[in-house]
């Protein structure tokens, strides 16, 4: 006798911020015996190797933004082509439910599912609902949120909102209970700096200049791990080598970033939803520099969730100067109690079972069809 095993189609834009929580959900669904397929865009090739999907469907996608009318029109045409691809995929896969994690690449498959009367679940990772999710919210059966308070949820959709938290990667969960490192006098001070592909440039410009301004006794204790763009790497390393630091490691990418976070006394980073959720999961204090220029200021809202509970400092990029950063580093490193209190505060915001909560919600929705 053939046993029917339901399939869930997970939709996520091909960047880590969308794909990592989608991947965590996929593992949780598979643990429940639910099959998973992934719909995404062409950018996914470099980071989808570990995604537990029995099939990956690449959908044409574009973002209809910018000032150019021709560019926006071209994006709409591309999205239309993606809708046709998505509709064929949804009919062929016949999913019990479709889950979207935001970004314009999710619009064609989510919209196709809604028009074909397949139940859809949205997951909004940020503290401000993105435009793609806002567009899809009206037709979604359930809207799951990564943060308790989320701005921009359409008024008619608020009754369908459920706070699940942001699904956490297994690599982060594996180090989530690592004790905060000792801050004994004269012990190493471990600083981790990263910013993603769009954020590493400002970190490479500001952080070295700030470290130069630290007292020599702090510099001698400082063990620095920093993400730097390939074009900035040599200059950044050479600059640090002349400062007499206790240790320096710079690289364009760290595969073991969760472990690096767990080893750090302090993190300086952007404030994407995954970063903020992982800082809370591991319990590490941070200086956060939200990515400027976003229309909805989602990273500023994300950073505020930790700043408001004393787990982080949020500094706008316009105020993120060497003098300001140096002053904050001295203040924190010379008052270790502030760091330990911030680390404890961060853990009060964590939801380690967010992937399981979301998987239960998806399974319940799929079973109701």
Swiss-Prot record:
<protein>
    <recommendedName>
        <fullName>UDP-N-acetylglucosamine--N-acetylmuramyl-(pentapeptide) pyrophosphoryl-undecaprenol N-acetylglucosamine transferase</fullName>
        <ecNumber>2.4.1.227</ecNumber>
    </recommendedName>
</protein>
<keyword id="KW-0328">Glycosyltransferase</keyword>
<dbReference type="GO" id="GO:0009252">
    <property type="term" value="P:peptidoglycan biosynthetic process"/>
</dbReference>
<dbReference type="GO" id="GO:0005886">
    <property type="term" value="C:plasma membrane"/>
</dbReference>
<feature type="binding site">
    <location>
        <position position="126"/>
    </location>
    <ligand>
        <name>UDP-N-acetyl-alpha-D-glucosamine</name>
    </ligand>
</feature>
<dbReference type="GO" id="GO:0051991">
    <property type="term" value="F:UDP-N-acetyl-D-glucosamine:N-acetylmuramoyl-L-alanyl-D-glutamyl-meso-2,6-diaminopimelyl-D-alanyl-D-alanine-diphosphoundecaprenol 4-beta-N-acetylglucosaminlytransferase activity"/>
</dbReference>
<dbReference type="GO" id="GO:0050511">
    <property type="term" value="F:undecaprenyldiphospho-muramoylpentapeptide beta-N-acetylglucosaminyltransferase activity"/>
</dbReference>
<feature type="binding site">
    <location>
        <position position="299"/>
    </location>
    <ligand>
        <name>UDP-N-acetyl-alpha-D-glucosamine</name>
    </ligand>
</feature>
<feature type="binding site">
    <location>
        <begin position="15"/>
        <end position="17"/>
    </location>
    <ligand>
        <name>UDP-N-acetyl-alpha-D-glucosamine</name>
    </ligand>
</feature>
<feature type="binding site">
    <location>
        <position position="169"/>
    </location>
    <ligand>
        <name>UDP-N-acetyl-alpha-D-glucosamine</name>
    </ligand>
</feature>
<dbReference type="Pfam" id="PF04101">
    <property type="entry name" value="Glyco_tran_28_C"/>
</dbReference>
<dbReference type="GO" id="GO:0051301">
    <property type="term" value="P:cell division"/>
</dbReference>
<dbReference type="GO" id="GO:0071555">
    <property type="term" value="P:cell wall organization"/>
</dbReference>
<comment type="function">
    <text>Cell wall formation. Catalyzes the transfer of a GlcNAc subunit on undecaprenyl-pyrophosphoryl-MurNAc-pentapeptide (lipid intermediate I) to form undecaprenyl-pyrophosphoryl-MurNAc-(pentapeptide)GlcNAc (lipid intermediate II).</text>
</comment>
<comment type="similarity">
    <text>Belongs to the glycosyltransferase 28 family. MurG subfamily.</text>
</comment>
<keyword id="KW-0573">Peptidoglycan synthesis</keyword>
<dbReference type="Pfam" id="PF03033">
    <property type="entry name" value="Glyco_transf_28"/>
</dbReference>
<keyword id="KW-0472">Membrane</keyword>
<keyword id="KW-0132">Cell division</keyword>
<keyword id="KW-0133">Cell shape</keyword>
<keyword id="KW-0808">Transferase</keyword>
<keyword id="KW-0961">Cell wall biogenesis/degradation</keyword>
<comment type="pathway">
    <text>Cell wall biogenesis; peptidoglycan biosynthesis.</text>
</comment>
<dbReference type="GO" id="GO:0005975">
    <property type="term" value="P:carbohydrate metabolic process"/>
</dbReference>
<dbReference type="GO" id="GO:0030259">
    <property type="term" value="P:lipid glycosylation"/>
</dbReference>
<feature type="binding site">
    <location>
        <position position="197"/>
    </location>
    <ligand>
        <name>UDP-N-acetyl-alpha-D-glucosamine</name>
    </ligand>
</feature>
<dbReference type="InterPro" id="IPR004276">
    <property type="entry name" value="GlycoTrans_28_N"/>
</dbReference>
<dbReference type="GO" id="GO:0008360">
    <property type="term" value="P:regulation of cell shape"/>
</dbReference>
<dbReference type="InterPro" id="IPR007235">
    <property type="entry name" value="Glyco_trans_28_C"/>
</dbReference>
<keyword id="KW-1003">Cell membrane</keyword>
<keyword id="KW-0131">Cell cycle</keyword>
<dbReference type="InterPro" id="IPR006009">
    <property type="entry name" value="GlcNAc_MurG"/>
</dbReference>
<keyword id="KW-0997">Cell inner membrane</keyword>
């Amino acid at each position: 006798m053939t046993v029917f095993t339901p399939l869930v189609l997970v939709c996520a834009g091909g960047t880590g911020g969308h794909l990592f929580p989608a991947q965590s959900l996929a593992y949780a669904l598979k643990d429940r015996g639910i099959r998973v397929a992934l719909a995404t865009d062409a950018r996914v090739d470099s980071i989808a190797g570990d995604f537990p999907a029995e099939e990956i469907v690449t959908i044409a996608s574009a973002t209809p933004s910018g000032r150019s009318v021709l560019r926006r029109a071209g994006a709409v045409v591309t999205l239309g082509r993606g809708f046709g691809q998505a509709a064929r995929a949804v009919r062929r896969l016949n999913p019990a439910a479709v889950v979207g994690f935001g970004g314009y690449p999710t619009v064609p498959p989510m919209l196709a599912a809604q028009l074909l009367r397949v139940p859809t679940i949205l997951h909004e990772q940020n503290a401000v609902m993105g435009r793609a999710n806002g567009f899809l919210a009206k037709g979604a059966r359930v809207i799951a949120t990564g943060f308790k308070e989320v701005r921009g949820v359409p008024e008619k959709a608020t009754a369908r909102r459920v706070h699940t938290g942001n699904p956490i990667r297994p690599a982060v969960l594996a180090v989530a209970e690592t004790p905060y490192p000792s801050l004994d006098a004269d012990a190493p001070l471990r600083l981790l700096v990263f910013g993603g592909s769009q954020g590493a440039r400002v970190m490479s410009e500001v952080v070295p200049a700030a470290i130069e301004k630290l007292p020599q006794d702090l510099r001698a204790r400082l063990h620095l791990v920093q993400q730097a763009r390939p074009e900035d790497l040599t200059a950044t390393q050479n600059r640090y080598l002349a400062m007499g630091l206790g240790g320096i490691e710079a690289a364009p990418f760290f595969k073991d970033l969760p472990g690096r976070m767990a080893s750090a006394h302090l993190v300086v980073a952007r404030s994407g939803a995954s970063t903020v959720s992982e800082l809370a999961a591991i319990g590490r204090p941070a200086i956060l520099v939200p990515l400027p220029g976003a229309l909805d200021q989602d990273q500023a809202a994300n950073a505020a969730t930790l700043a408001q509970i004393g787990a982080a400092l949020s500094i706008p990029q316009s105020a993120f100067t060497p003098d300001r950063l140096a002053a904050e580093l001295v203040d924190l490193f010379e008052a270790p109690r502030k760091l330990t209190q911030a680390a404890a505060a961060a853990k009060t915001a964590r939801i380690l079972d967010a992937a399981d909560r979301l998987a239960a919600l998806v399974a319940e929705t799929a079973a109701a069809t």
